[in-house]
């Protein structure tokens, strides 16, 4: 399971002209689900995403996680993160989970975030989405479990 996380000052996702999720300061989480992923990996990745210390403390050091910084989370499904790009000029998606399994794990991940008392907004699974963000820093990390 893969999360591309970006520290943002604001972010939103729009589906068919309707804003489905919007946050102020916090994390934009692009979530990719691979074939061998399961609930255990989703738990671990959620723990890492919410615990990752990439927000500045009073001394300007990256020492606070999103909860400590008072931020929110916007989770957007992103199957292209599971692409195999090692060969050729066209990505292969053979490493990705089936759509049904990916959606179940995406929903599970979102619910785990919410159980941690995080303001968690979402896109719409498998929809054509437009994501807008202001990357703060820029600060972007690839987390994989």
Curated annotation (Swiss-Prot):
Gene3D superfamilies: D-tyrosyl-tRNA(Tyr) deacylase. One of its GO terms (cellular component) is cytoplasm. It catalyses: glycyl-tRNA(Ala) + H2O = tRNA(Ala) + glycine + H(+); a D-aminoacyl-tRNA + H2O = a tRNA + a D-alpha-amino acid + H(+). GO terms for molecular function: D-tyrosyl-tRNA(Tyr) deacylase activity; Gly-tRNA(Ala) deacylase activity; Ser(Gly)-tRNA(Ala) hydrolase activity; tRNA binding. InterPro entries: Daa-tRNA_deacyls_DTD, DTD-like_sf. GO terms for biological process: D-amino acid catabolic process. The keyword tRNA-binding applies. Homodimer. Belongs to the DTD family. A Gly-cisPro motif from one monomer fits into the active site of the other monomer to allow specific chiral rejection of L-amino acids. This is D-aminoacyl-tRNA deacylase.
């Amino acid at each position: 399971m893969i999360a591309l996380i970006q520290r943002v000052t604001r972010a939103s996702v729009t589906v068919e002209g309707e804003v489905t999720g919007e946050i102020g300061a916090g994390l934009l989480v692009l979530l990719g689900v691979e074939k061998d992923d399961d609930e255990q990996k989703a738990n671990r990745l959620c723990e890492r995403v919410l615990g990752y210390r990439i927000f500045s403390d009073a001394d300007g050091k990256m020492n606070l996680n999103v909860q400590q910084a008072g931020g929110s989370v916007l989770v957007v499904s992103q199957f292209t993160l599971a692409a195999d790009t090692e060969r050729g000029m066209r990505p292969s998606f053979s490493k990705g989970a089936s759509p049904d399994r990916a959606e179940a794990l995406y929903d599970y991940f979102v619910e785990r975030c919410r159980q941690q008392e995080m303001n968690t907004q979402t896109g719409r699974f498998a929809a054509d989405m437009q994501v807008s963000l202001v990357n703060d820093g820029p600060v972007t990390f690839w987390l994989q479990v």
